[in-house]
Amino acid sequence: MAYHWQVIGRLLIALLRFYKRFISPLLGPRCRFAPSCSEYAMTAIARFGPLRGSWLAARRLGRCHPFHPGGFDPVPDAPTSSPSSCRCKGPHP
């Protein structure tokens, strides 16, 4: 099942690269954030997978409007998977 999520993630990143290469130049620079929303989405999907990465990208797109000041807004770091930082009650390998 993990393989399917990797394929979906690669497909989403390929679509974002297509947008950035062919569509974005026609629209001109519009993003008020650094990194741009498309770069943010590609990084989020690569770091967190297609499901959570897409959610983070959608939240970012929701903030990209004329009434938001914008600025530097990096993708959050991936959480560490140490037993001390986990809230689950199951054993860790």
Swiss-Prot record:
* GO CC annotations, alphabetized: plasma membrane
Cellular location of this protein? Cell inner membrane
- Signal peptide from the UniProt entry: none
Main localization, broad class:
membrane
List the residue ranges of the region (Disordered).
Answer: 72-93
**What are the record keywords, sorted?**
Cell inner membrane, Cell membrane, Membrane
Q: What kind of membrane protein is this, topologically?
A: Peripheral membrane protein
The function of this protein is: Could be involved in insertion of integral membrane proteins into the membrane.
According to its UniProt record, which protein family does this protein belong to? Belongs to the UPF0161 family.
Q: What is this protein called?
A: Putative membrane protein insertion efficiency factor
